Amino acid sequence: HVKINVYIADDTFMAAGGGYKCSININDIQEVQLFNEMPKDNFTRTNGGSTNEYDIGNYKGRTYGKCMLFIWDGYSPVLMIKSSNKTVFVNSKEDGYIKQMYEKLTDYHK
């Protein structure tokens, strides 16, 4: 049974699940964006897990390039976080959680 955890701890954005982990220092975040659904970008899995329930791990998108996904299929919104060397997409099964995360991260950048 796979779990995906997305949280902020000690000024670091963390996403973990299925044996994959991504951490970005909040000061290194260059862009935070909220999407109604996962962008259609022909993502190709380079090293990760994919079922009809989730997509986790390392992927490559046509527009976004190398990125990490911690995505439950069929859940929205989707949060994209970009630093100089990483792009990560996350969502949650918990209603309102990702919007809250988005607001927290954009507050840091005011």
Could you tell me what each predicted segment is?
Residues 1-26:
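Conserved beta-hairpin
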Residues 16-25, 31-84:
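Non-transmembrane, membrane-adjacent beta-strand/coil modules in membrane-associated proteins
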Residues 23-28, 89-93:
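Short amphipathic beta-strand/extended segments with alternating polar/hydrophobic composition
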